């Protein structure tokens, strides 16, 4: 397991905690980027006191890979949270990621959202484990 920390221009800290055995696994492109961007733009950048932390983890659990993107930002409005995976929004949002995952990997995979206002948000992405040799 490798853990790295970095400070991005004094705006926030990023912590990566990735199981090294997953470095060679294959996954669809652009699944994590929108999740991390949302954590920064709509989470930690909105903190009145500034700063904040975004933590990205990846672990293998049996035959799945579980990614989490967590922030200690402002959280998501509880009125909006239940609809984020089903309603259209601007950009390449989490609905797009969720639909792409389910279309490619199956309905048992996708995103789960947890959030508390003024505490932060956790987005969990679950996909099947796929070493490079399984994708040809």
Model-predicted regions and their roles:
Residues 47-49, 112-120:
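A short beta-strand-to-loop micro-motif at the C-terminal edge of the catalytic HATPase_c
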Residues 51-63:
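Short beta-strand/loop element within the Bergerat-fold HATPase_c
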Residues 13-23, 116:
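Conserved catalytic submotifs in the C-terminal HATPase_c
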Residues 5, 28, 38, 82-110:
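ATP phosphate-binding glycine-rich loop and adjacent ATP-lid/helix-beta elements
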